[in-house]
Amino acid sequence: MEQNNSLFSRIINANLVLQIIFGIAAGIILATVSHDLAKSAATLGGLFVGALKAVAPILVFVLVASSIANQKKGSNTNMRPIISLYLIGTLLAALTAVTMSFAFPTTLVLVTGAEGAAPPQGIIEVLRTLVFKIVDNPINALRTANYIGILAWAIGLGIALHHASQNTKDVLSDMSHGVSFIVRFIIRLAPIGIFGLVANTIAETGFSALGGYASLLGVLLGSMAIVALVINPLMVFIKIRKNPYPLVFTCLRESGVTAFFTRSSAANIPVNMTLCEKLNIHEDSYSVSIPLGATINMAGAAITITVLTLAAVNTMGIQVDMFTALLLSVVAAISACGASGVAGGSLLLIPLACGLFGISNDVAMQVVGVGFIIGVIQDSAETGLNSSTDVLFTAACHRARERS
């Protein structure tokens, strides 16, 4: 009995990452033993993701407004190099996906298209939607978790209150600390939430439906692994001039794992902000760069759009020259940056990319259908890469500034 208590206390008092690993293992075991119980555990996962999604909009709004209002004269938020890394990283991810698709060409067994889905008609529509999100009603932006709109209003309010009395600034600062406290409490519940998510996912799918798409998943996941373990570390090394892997693995472990199971960049914003605080990054920087990254830093989405589009091209027997492939990389990168402005995200931007090759919308929507089938893995890996990269690039720019 004492041994059991000792084991339980070790689990309770363990590092959060170890607790998450234990939650993953427990979820797999439960799904293997009882599918019904595992499906019931979905409530725990839903509550955890719901809590993160609920707190994220108000966290971003209060933190950004407080940070700008309390900003000291002459301080530098370091946003330009961070945004540059976001955009360059997304483009390099698309180029990596093109290279992998040429090296390991895949074809698809097309299925019924995604019913009721409404893809954008062109790149202009994607960008137009993104721009109009800036002028959204602030209450509606908070209600719908429109982070572009939330950022715009928070920045505007922060600038307006920058010259307010110190008491007003202190109220904003105290509110940001209060919301941060709630976030830390929710994050401590991550092992329980991830236990529920893992148990339900395995019980619902068993991953058996993915067997027919092994080669496609191989190219997708291989591209994402190359970006996470080769391209991103190289970019960070160029920035900080020292071994990037300790920072890379910290971001993957503490941000990527949670994002993988929540499958939501928005839900992972509080996790990323807590990690930035742990890495001693200036709040002025990460309070803006993390929610902005959740909107425009979309390396995983660029890979998904590129790989599935080229798989459709191969299936239709269309020959692709290098110039067109490079053009696809640029279109995929720009589209990926606007993925947050499209319901359904990266998958519903595939018809836009397919239009480059004259592929009909009917066929393109069947490709989207394939995307939904493999989504349990593709969407998880995509979100893990996107979200962990937000912290990685923010931390890299912070360390580069400290070094200079």
UniProtKB/Swiss-Prot annotation:
One of its GO terms (biological process) is serine transport. The chain crosses the membrane at residues 11-31, 44-64, 82-102, 144-164, 179-199, 218-238, 290-310, 316-336, 363-383. It catalyses: L-serine(in) + Na(+)(in) = L-serine(out) + Na(+)(out); L-threonine(in) + Na(+)(in) = L-threonine(out) + Na(+)(out). GO terms for cellular component: plasma membrane. InterPro entries: Na-dicarboxylate_symporter, Na:dicarbo_symporter_sf, Ser_Thr_transp_SstT. Pfam families: SDF. It is found in: Cell inner membrane. Keywords: Amino-acid transport, Cell inner membrane, Cell membrane, Membrane, Symport, Transmembrane, Transmembrane helix, Transport. It comes from the Bacteria. It is a multi-pass membrane protein. GO terms for molecular function: neutral L-amino acid:sodium symporter activity. The keyword Transmembrane helix applies. The keyword Nucleotide-binding does not apply. Belongs to the dicarboxylate/amino acid:cation symporter (DAACS) (TC 2.A.23) family. Involved in the import of serine and threonine into the cell, with the concomitant import of sodium (symport system). HAMAP family: Ser_Thr_transp_SstT (MF_01582). This is Serine/threonine transporter SstT. The lineage of its organism: Bacteria, Pseudomonadati, Thermodesulfobacteriota, Desulfobulbia, Desulfobulbales.
